[in-house]
Amino acid sequence: MGSVVAILRVMPESPDIDLEKLKKALKDALPGIKDIQEEPIGFGLKALKLAAIVNDAGGETDALEGKLNAVPGVERAEIIEVTLN
């Protein structure tokens, strides 16, 4: 099995959340994160778009979403793209 790059969008719970603290919490929860960018959504809310390298074994992407959704301050994490590493 190889690895893939998963691109995810993470929506914070509110526009008032400290995005730098959330970025650190996400990196702590998932060491495979390689890049995090802020993406304006509207009304002051910003999503975080991140790239993570994960094993391409079955169920790994679901587990990835689960880990990120469990981070305090995350409203929702969803995979928007998966590509070969």
UniProtKB/Swiss-Prot annotation:
Domain of life: Archaea
CDD domains recorded: EF1B (cd00292)
GO terms, molecular function: translation elongation factor activity
Record's keyword terms, sorted: Elongation factor, Protein biosynthesis
Residues in coiled coil: none
Protein biosynthesis listed as a keyword: yes
Pfam families (alphabetical): EF1_GNE
The keyword Protein biosynthesis belongs to this UniProt entry's keyword annotation: yes
InterPro entries in the cross-refs: eEF-1beta-like_sf (IPR036219), EF1B_bsu/dsu_GNE (IPR014038), Transl_elong_EF1B/ribsomal_bS6 (IPR014717), Transl_elong_EF1B_B_arc (IPR004542)
Job description of the protein: Promotes the exchange of GDP for GTP in EF-1-alpha/GDP, thus allowing the regeneration of EF-1-alpha/GTP that could then be used to form the ternary complex EF-1-alpha/GTP/AAtRNA.
Protein family: Belongs to the EF-1-beta/EF-1-delta family.
HAMAP family: EF1_beta (MF_00043)
Protein name per UniProt: Elongation factor 1-beta
Organism: Methanoregula boonei (strain DSM 21154 / JCM 14090 / 6A8)
Taxonomic lineage of the native organism: Archaea, Methanobacteriati, Methanobacteriota, Stenosarchaea group, Methanomicrobia
